[in-house]
């Protein structure tokens, strides 16, 4: 979503 693109979310895994 747009909010995800705004902030660099760390790759969980």
UniProtKB/Swiss-Prot annotation:
Q: Which UniProt keywords apply?
A: Amidation, Amphibian defense peptide, Secreted
Compartments (UniProt record): Secreted
Recorded GO cellular component terms are: extracellular region
Single GO BP term: defense response
Modified positions (Glycine amide) in chain numbering: 13
Q: Does the keyword Secreted apply?
A: yes
Q: In which tissues is it expressed?
A: Expressed by the skin dorsal glands.
- Belongs to which family? Belongs to the frog skin active peptide (FSAP) family. Peroniin subfamily.
Name-wise, this protein is Peroniin-1.1b
**Which organism encodes this protein?**
Litoria peronii (Emerald spotted tree frog)
């Amino acid at each position: 979503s747009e909010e995800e693109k705004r902030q660099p979310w760390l790759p969980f895994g």
